[in-house]
């Protein structure tokens, strides 16, 4: 059985117009239009017996009803908010209207029995110039009536009138400034009024200087003064144990945060050795473009589709959907630890809900140990005293004759005795060009072959050093232990066990799973 669709009835006003003449109106429509419902009857009969007018109930006027606001212990109050009386001006207003109408001479009606001949009459010309215009100006004097700003209070009831008397306005006060100067024989006061540059007004400058004409009365009292210590003489209290920061955090808050991150029952603890974890942890989750202007100091969300799954650069960050902001803490050994709280999205339901464990990634920063000092040599030792050397006083000049050379005869004897010692053959260039390994090319240049050598970007920052042969060379050897990977033989079952996973989960090879046998039903 199909239920009939309910149609909405027309409004009560339209139904009343059509059904009133036929007499088929429903009773609820008649009562609503003619205002004869139960609520309307209560208002009609109740208002005839009870009258609440003039009390100011739910009116929002704030007049206080008929009696007004009356202070405690006094008489009747003053009506507030009534219609004020308009104060009319004392001048006689002029009526503004049309000007007086001038009569116009009209021609008498023509009798049909009279003659149609119009007699000519002599008349003067028409005066086109205007006549004399009389101008009268009336001046109405203003009466000397004092006016006061007093509130006008009126009432429309039969109660007694109450007039509020305002105080008389106070006349403006005049201020007179006087200056009195007392003479003090111990001081000389000089008063000047000179304008300075950039000032728009004059100001009195008083200079107080001590004089020699004072007299000492009585015996001066010697007051013992206390010596104020130097600012470097205060003592600094060293707490026990010594503090590591200027404003240390409360131990309760620090311990609570440390316990919340190191709880192995709730969070998986994963240490990270890659230095990218300190500055750009997103490169450990996925391969992405590097933005040098972006600082990864906030919580990051990684969205990845199951169809486009990509192996992350670091296996520890597999299935990471959210990586929190960095947190700094202190370990028991006194090292600084950088922690980030992450969430894995290992399982995803059809409704879109992601299920995964929470992981605590951390990296401990080792302390900076002080190395042994290197002995340095002092350059330019001096006693600190300045020494001035005057060249013209301490130098010795010998006046020699350049024309007479006593060594000229000796040089001539040596040349004659040993001619090979002063031979000019040593100044000749005997180098010869050898073209035995050269090749002659005729024509254009040979085309050079270019090879592209791929360069892989290393996550670690490259370090460059310049060897100084004249100074000291300090070498810090660094040794790294490589992790030896032991692969199982093909005869053993392939079972992958993650030793770094503290949760105890494992992945079993599908070949080791028991096969389900099909159950057949025999008739």
UniProtKB/Swiss-Prot annotation:
Alphabetical UniProt keywords: Capsid protein, Cytoplasmic inwards viral transport, Disulfide bond, DNA-binding, Host endosome, Host Golgi apparatus, Host nucleus, Host-virus interaction, Late protein, Microtubular inwards viral transport, Phosphoprotein, Viral penetration into host nucleus, Virion, Virus entry into host cell
Post-translational modification remark: Highly phosphorylated.
Residue numbers covered by motif Nuclear localization signal: 1-10, 514-522
Annotated disulfide bonds: 19-25
Superkingdom to which the source organism belongs: Viruses
GO biological process: microtubule-dependent intracellular transport of viral material towards nucleus; symbiont entry into host cell; viral penetration into host nucleus
Function: Minor protein of the capsid that localizes along the inner surface of the virion, within the central cavities beneath the L1 pentamers. Plays a role in capsid stabilization through interaction with the major capsid protein L1. Once the virion enters the host cell, L2 escorts the genomic DNA into the nucleus by promoting escape from the endosomal compartments and traffic through the host Golgi network.
Subunit structure: Interacts with major capsid protein L1. Interacts with E2; this interaction inhibits E2 transcriptional activity but not the DNA replication function E2. Interacts with host GADD45GIP1. Interacts with host HSPA8; this interaction is required for L2 nuclear translocation. Interacts with host importins KPNB2 and KPNB3. Forms a complex with importin alpha2-beta1 heterodimers via interaction with the importin alpha2 adapter. Interacts with host DYNLT1; this interaction is essential for virus intracellular transport during entry.
Similarity-based family: Belongs to the papillomaviridae L2 protein family.
Protein name according to UniProt: Minor capsid protein L2
């Amino acid at each position: 059985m199909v239920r009939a669709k309910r149609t909405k009835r027309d409004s009560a006003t339209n139904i009343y117009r059509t059904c009133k003449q036929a007499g088929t109106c429903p009773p609820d429509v008649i009562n609503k239009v003619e205002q004869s419902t139960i609520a309307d009857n209560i208002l009609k009969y109740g208002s005839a017996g009870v009258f609440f007018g003039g009390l100011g109930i739910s009116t929002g006027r704030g007049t206080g009803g008929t009696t007004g606001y009356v202070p405690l212990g006094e008489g009747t109050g003053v009506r507030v908010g009534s219609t004020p009386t308009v104060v009319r001006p004392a001048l006689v207003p002029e009526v503004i209207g049309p000007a007086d109408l001038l009569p116009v001479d009209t021609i008498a009606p023509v009798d049909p029995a009279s003659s149609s001949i119009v007699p000519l009459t002599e008349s003067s010309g028409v005066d086109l110039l205007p006549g004399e215009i009389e101008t009268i100006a009336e001046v109405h004097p203003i009466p000397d009536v004092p006016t006061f700003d007093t509130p006008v209070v009126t009432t429309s009831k039969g109660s007694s009138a109450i007039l509020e008397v305002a105080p008389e306005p106070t006349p403006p006060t005049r201020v007179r400034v006087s200056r009195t100067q007392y003479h003090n024989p111990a001081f000389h006061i000089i008063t000047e009024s000179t304008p300075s540059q950039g000032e728009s007004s004059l100001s009195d400058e008083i200079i107080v200087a001590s004089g020699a004409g004072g007299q000492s009365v009585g015996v001066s009292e010697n007051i013992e003064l206390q010596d104020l210590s130097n600012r470097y003489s205060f003592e600094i209290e060293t707490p026990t144990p010594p503090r590591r920061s200027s404003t240390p955090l409360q131990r309760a808050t620090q311990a609570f945060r440390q316990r919340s991150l190191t709880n192995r029952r709730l969070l998986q603890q994963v240490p990270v050795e890659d230095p990218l974890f300190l500055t750009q942890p997103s490169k450990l989750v996925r391969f992405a473009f590097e933005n040098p202007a972006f600082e990864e100091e906030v919580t990051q969300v990684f969205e990845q589709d199951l169809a486009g799954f990509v192996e992350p650069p670091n296996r520890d960050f597999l299935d990471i959907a959210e990586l929190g902001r960095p947190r700094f803490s202190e370990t028991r050994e006194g090292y600084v630890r950088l922690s980030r709280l992450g969430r894995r999205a290992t399982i995803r339901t059809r409704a879109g809900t992601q299920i995964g464990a929470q992981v605590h990634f951390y990296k401990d920063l080792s302390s900076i140990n002080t190395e042994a000092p290197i002995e340095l040599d002092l350059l330019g030792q001096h006693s600190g005293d300045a020494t001035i050397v005057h060249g013209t006083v301490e130098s010795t000049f010998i006046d020699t004759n350049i024309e007479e050379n006593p060594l000229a005869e000796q040089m001539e004897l040596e040349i004659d005795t040993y001619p090979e010692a002063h031979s000019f053959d040593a100044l000749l260039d005997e180098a010869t060009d050898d073209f035995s390994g050269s090749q002659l090319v005729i024509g254009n240049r040979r085309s050079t072959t270019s090879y592209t050598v791929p360069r892989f970007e290393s996550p670690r920052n490259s370090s460059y050093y310049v060897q100084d042969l004249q100074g000291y060379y300090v070498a810090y050897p660094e040794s790294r232990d490589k992790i030896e990977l032991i692969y199982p033989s093909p005869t053993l079952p392939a079972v992958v066990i993650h030793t770094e996973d503290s949760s105890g989960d494992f992945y079993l090879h599908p070949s080791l799973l028991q096969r389900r046998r099909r159950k057949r039903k025999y008739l």
